[in-house]
C-alpha cells in the first residue's frame, strides 16, 4: 500500500533514490562485519554448548544452539532490511502526502511504521514457533525432557536476534551522529548554508542515518 502512494515530482524521487541507495549501502557494509561476528560466535557456541546424558551416552545439543543462533541473526537482519526498505519508501511519500493534508501524511507514515513493527513480531513468532516444533521432533526420540531441552536451545535464537539488533542499533547510532556532525560542520560552519540543504551532499548521508 505504501509503495502505491504518490512519490512526488522527479526531484523528490531523485533525492529519495539517493537516500535509498545510501541506506542499502550502509546495510551491506554492516552485514559484512556482522557476518564475521555471527560466524565466530556460532563456532564458540558449538564448542561450549550443553551436553545431556541419555542412557550413559552424551548427547550434544551445542550444534543445535549454534544453528539457532545463526537463524536468529538472519531473521533479525531480515527484519532490519524490511524496515529500511519501507522507511525509504515511506519518507518521500509522506512528504508528498503532507502537501495535500496532515491526515494523509499521518496515514502514510503510520502505515510505514506498522510494517516494521508487524514484521519484527511476525518474524519472531515464525522463528520461535517453527524452531520449537522442529526441536520437539528432534529430541522426541532421545529420551530427554523434550520441552525443557527445546526451550534451552531456543536461547540461541534469541541471542542471535538480539546480537544483530544491538549491533545494528549501536552502529546505526554512531553513523547517524557522525553524518549529522559532518554535515553541520561542512554546511553551516564552512559553507554557510542552512541545515539539510540539498546543496550539501552530506545531507544525503545525514538522511541515510535518520533511517
Predicted segments, located by residue:
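Hydrophobic, small-residue-rich transmembrane alpha-helices and their short perimembrane loops
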Residues: 1-211
